[in-house]
Amino acid sequence: MGRAAREQNDDFLLPVRRLWTDGADTLYGGYYTRKDIREVVAYAAVRGIDVIPEIDMPGHCLQAIDSYPWLACFGRGSWGQSFSSPLCVGKDRTLAFCESVWEELFELFPYEYVHMGGDEVDKSNWKRCPDCQTRMRAEGLPDEAALQAWFMHRMQRFCEARGRRMIGWDEILEGGAVPGATVMWWRPWEPQSVSVATRQGCEVVLCPQSWFYFSLEEDANSLARICRFDMLPDSLSDAQKRQIKGVQGNLWTEKIPTWSRAEYMFYPRLLVLAEKGWTEPGKFDEDAFMSRLLDYCRRLDDEGVNYRIPSLTNYHAVSVFTDSVRTAVVCPLPGAVLRYTLDGSVPTVNSPRYDAPLLIRDDCTLHIRPYHADGRTGDWITVRYEKQDYARPLEPRDTEPGLCVDWYFRRFP
């Protein structure tokens, strides 16, 4: 709500109908009833869509643990170094709980695939938990990574016995093979996961964070990064490449309060992701796609989609000059109106229009923000102008004829 006021952007306003009061606190949220879920499933079915549920296990279960503390290793929710502590998979009671949750979901979601999660599991509690250590000894498991693999294998067998196929994030590969599972590769810092999964015969869905996480704000390079993503690297064999089933764009909505904001984060990135997905590898034409981008924007206008206005161009974040300089910022979207400020404030619809280059004679910070012809706002840019005198020339002493060269042979990131 504060961001909506700070940035003059109603996309960040929580809808009033979604707010409710608990005591003195105004909260947002809610839950789905069984009836709600059945309505969603039926609505999606008419449109050829399967709504695949993900109940993340054994990590990301803090809400369940808060409600049922016995699910945790030490009877309470806690945090590890980066993530909340997981379920205690050493207790049979915990395993029965997990199975009962999925039994109910199988009833509501009549699909072949279910998503078990399996990511971001902090295993530090398992190292100290008597129940988990007993489980490891009983199953002959060498370490806590193998304990997670044991849990995932058990849940996979549970799903398969009920005619379902398990999906998990690429962490499910840690601690042992999971043949038959579908792996969603999301960690680009673990590139070997794709090769490992496909060698095991697993199907793989590509959704690497740096490219396909649409909850990360788009910038001037986002579209090009997706365009240049190597879908099927040469390091994979032909058989492994056939295990790559497709791509997925992820939009996590913790900070997406409205559907309008969701559209803004999805488009136009979703367009290039779709085109990458259906184009034969090696034949995607970035220039051709970019040449069609404005046509796509017009189509989105006709559909009433709140897409992100293409990034402003022709500027540098810092511009140094000696006497004066003229701005040269350009908006690729025809009909857009640019508004600017020079006092450090956020541009609003009431700020001066940027209709022609500005003459800059002194230090200043320029903010420019695009507005669609219908009034929708885009992301603003910041350009810092610094007036400087010419640097004094060096006065070399004790020089010798020739050049001195240092050669560094290494790979720089």
Question: Which residues does each PLM region occupy?
Answer:
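Substrate-binding cleft of carbohydrate-active enzyme catalytic domains
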Residues: 1-164
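Substrate-binding groove of N-acetylhexosamine-processing glycoside hydrolases
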Residues: 39, 92-113, 120, 134-338
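Domain-scale activation on soluble regions of proteins
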Residues: 41, 45-50, 57, 62-64, ...
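Residues within well-ordered beta-strands of beta-sheet-rich folds
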Residues: 50, 54, 367-369, 413
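Short, solvent-exposed loop/turn elements at domain surfaces
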Residues: 255-257, 348-349, 412
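Short, compositionally stereotyped local motifs that mark structural "simplifiers"
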Residues: 280, 284-404
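Aromatic-lined ligand-binding clefts that engage carbohydrates, nucleic acids, or primary amines
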Residues: 329-331, 408, 413
